[in-house]
């Protein structure tokens, strides 16, 4: 199975392996995190080992490749071939037991000089909408009905259960975001009072999902040039990629450069080299990265979906506040501001139900803002070869490669929340 450069150009991806997804029969690519720039797991022959590696062998321009596949700029790839059968992999020995992926980089044509600039911009969004979730009114009426049913199942009469529920429902959920008193919020049938309204201060502060996500923006710039004749061919490329992820703290940046050269000084002698350098930096959203990257919020999307739609993101006054002379200082629902006049996050210790232990003392946006996880990598890859032809049908080939990598991983966990 072969994927050529035209197919690669049609798909705006940060890793050449992502191009293989759906293009090669029998090949599986697994990216369970969704972080921009992450190297997807590739399975050609399924899972052959429980504890050992199931990763295929990558071969770039004839040499086994041990670096990150995300170091390779897809714009520099001429073709990708996948070898599945044992006979095709015999050349590489036991390293090829999980299959082989052959990657061929672009080289200059034999005639002419050219310079090409490719600029691409794109946006990414969630492909499938989320399930509809309860709004605040639906949630409150459902909680009222559930608590009343619980009281009846414990022996209370329907009338007693209704009275007790109306009196105690706010203490059960932890907060009253409406313009009605706690015991006047519902009628006898469990419906919100006809004149019950969410206070203005809370209206725009109950959405946890939208502030955490965004439409991703992708910018890619590639400059390449080449010159060639019958004896010498040289190609260079420079690339820059900036990709913002679906969550606001996730992004991937890559600066890459490559040089490919082939020389034929004599009819019987051919030599060449390829050099590639990459600097990349990845910012992870700790809450979305999963337990492999963080022990803070293990699943931010679950938190955003699970938290009840009555709990605000920021701190609010839960009662009217009056000055000593009786004048109104703050209305119920107003934001509680800090000394600089900014909004303060609410960790739920005072506003959420005591039974909701999973969210109390936690805050998706606050933790995402304070905690940091990022890594930076510098890579240099080089291949060189010499082919000497002698007699009529013999060629002596000598190949060598070099791989240098420097990686810096950094993580910061705050002491305020979480």
How should each PLM-predicted stretch be described?
Residues 1-258, 263-272, 276-278, 290-294, ...:
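Short, small/polar-rich motifs associated with maturation and membrane association
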Residues 1-3, 80, 103, 344-355, ...:
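Proteins with a high burden of low-complexity, intrinsically disordered sequence enriched in S/T/G/P/A and R
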Residues 15, 135-136, 363, 407, ...:
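Intrinsic-disorder/low-complexity, polar/charged segments
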Residues 25, 305-309, 392:
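Proline-centered flexible-loop/turn and helix-kink motifs
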Residues 127-129, 283, 365, 408:
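A short, polar/proline- and glycine-enriched secondary-structure boundary/capping micro-motif
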Residues 191, 246-256, 262, 276-291, ...:
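Small-side-chain secondary-structure face that scaffolds active or pore-lining regions
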Residues 206-208, 366, 412:
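Tryptophan-centered motif/residue detector
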Residues 278, 284-377:
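Acidic/polar loop-and-plug regions of large Gram-negative outer-membrane beta-barrel proteins
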